[in-house]
């Protein structure tokens, strides 16, 4: 899927969904600007929400993929998040045929800011639980020393309605610096 709503999809993506027996929507690394029902109505498919536990701990998706045509929907580019890469590699290891359909991602969408993509350094995440974590601050510091921008991916937990806001991220960076 793209970054916005049910219509923000490539033609290849739409065709893959139509051919699928089972459709999962990963709903914990990003949030779309539409409801699950909007997706189901637009694609005319039942869509099962895939939380962190289902994707990272359970084998349900892989087991279904062995005997059925499964679509695994994510907002943005499917191989930006490490959890998606892990699922892809586990499927390959089990001999499950996979195809990846790329779409717009936050990495390309950041161009709307006017900043040049080639001037970005390492990307980092600011987790919800960041009490003793300093890596994001040092990624920023290293990027700044090289004259590069930093893209921060802000953690979220939709099941608990918890999100790292921009203000939270700034407070975190200031706390680590001081």
What does each model-identified segment do?
Residues 13, 57-61, 136, 140, ...:
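Generic hydrophobic alpha-helical segments
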Residues 49-52, 103, 178:
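A generic structural motif
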